[in-house]
């Protein structure tokens, strides 16, 4: 299956997963992000940071949450439906670590986690192209990793796998595309780096909250 691989880290890293919504049976899934890596223009407002991902014709949806077991000294499955808890507004907003569309390695990771993951739609057999591979041949393969605080108050590393027939991206002003999101993320990174270089030379300059929230390392400013 030919898919265009897109690494969404430049756009979605550090974003908040603000909202989750899905139909009964999860045929349609909507994820709403509050994007921090976007430099707002003078006429833009905070609502312009919103990016909605709407997945149509969902073939498979699975999640996992790994917590650190101090007694066993290893990561173990928390066995919690964190996505459902978020949809019911029962937990704090996850912070995105990574996201991608169309990466072959996503299917590899999904297969490794298939038996222990919580399947909200589909089943592990759907990952096998020689059996019931409706997931393996899906036009859209999406993966998300995030830091979460579970309803119990425990910190965990969460992952979401999703296979669908289509993906629509929507912003505050209407339809968007992944390329535009990536360009905005790359533009923010360039402006963030320039901002901190100026601040390094002239500490008296006023702070800009669009960039101040993330402190740079020495390597970032080289």
Predicted regions and their residues:
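Surface-exposed, interaction-prone regions used to assemble/regulate multi-protein complexes
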Residues: 1-222
């Amino acid at each position: 299956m030919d898919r265009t691989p897109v690494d969404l880290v430049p756009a979605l890293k550090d974003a908040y997963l603000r909202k989750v919504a899905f139909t009964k049976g999860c045929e349609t899934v909507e994820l709403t992000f509050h994007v921090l890596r976007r430099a707002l223009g003078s006429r833009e407002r905070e609502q312009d940071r919103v990016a909605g991902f709407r997945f149509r014709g969902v073939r498979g949806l699975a999640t996992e949450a790994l917590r650190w077991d101090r007694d066993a000294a290893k990561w173990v499955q928390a066995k919690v439906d964190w996505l459902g808890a978020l949809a019911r507004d029962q937990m704090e907003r996850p912070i995105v670590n990574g996201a991608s569309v169309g990466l072959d390695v996503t299917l590899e990771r999904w297969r490794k986690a298939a038996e222990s993951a919580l399947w909200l739609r589909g089943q592990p057999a759907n990952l096998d192209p020689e059996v019931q591979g409706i997931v393996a041949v899906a036009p859209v393969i999406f993966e998300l990793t995030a830091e979460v605080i579970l309803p119990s108050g425990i910190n965990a590393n969460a992952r979401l796998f999703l296979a669908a027939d289509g993906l629509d991206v929507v912003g505050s002003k209407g339809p968007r595309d992944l390329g535009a999101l990536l360009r905005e993320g790359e533009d923010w990174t360039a402006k963030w780096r320039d901002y901190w270089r100026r601040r390094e030379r002239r500490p008296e300059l006023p702070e800009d909250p669009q960039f101040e929230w993330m402190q740079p390392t020495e390597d970032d400013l080289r």
